[in-house]
């Protein structure tokens, strides 16, 4: 498949809309930022492609990190692909992945690669440094690291 030709500024704008939607936990803004068949990899279990797969995740993040901020540290573009290195910060004020609120500040890295189609993000490969966050709050979700 041939890469769509877009400018660096168009690619950056598309990805910045996506991160604004995540930071604001705004599904309507996400629907404007991504294609209707947007793939988020690794895909949340039991969800089909598209922006609505983020509804429960946004709800959990709104409760867990209500003051969440996302700072884009680096953005690299090539053709219709954008690589992002960013940092999430906030206070774990509500349950997150089964861990009760700790009221502790957290800061962790995220790394993503995005594919752009029709001025929207059509595919995202995304990794978060959850281990760093778990170390900061002093707990891991039940079942992780138990050898089970």
What are these regions (language model features)?
Residues 1-148:
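C-terminal and inter-domain tail/linker signature
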């Amino acid at each position: 498949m041939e890469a769509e030709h877009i400018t660096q500024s168009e690619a950056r704008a598309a990805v910045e809309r996506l991160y604004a939607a995540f930071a604001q936990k705004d599904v309507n803004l996400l629907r404007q930022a991504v294609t209707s068949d947007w793939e988020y990899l690794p895909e949340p279990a039991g969800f089909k492609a598209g922006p609505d797969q983020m509804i429960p995740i946004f709800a959990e993040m709104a409760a867990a990190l209500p003051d969440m901020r996302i700072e884009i540290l680096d953005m690299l573009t090539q053709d219709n692909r954008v690589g992002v290195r960013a940092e999430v910060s906030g206070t774990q004020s509500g349950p997150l992945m089964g861990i009760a609120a700790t009221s502790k500040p957290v800061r962790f890295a995220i790394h993503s690669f995005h594919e752009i189609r029709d001025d929207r993000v059509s595919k995202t490969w995304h990794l978060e440094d959850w281990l760093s966050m778990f170390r900061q709050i002093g707990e891991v979700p039940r079942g992780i690291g138990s050898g089970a």
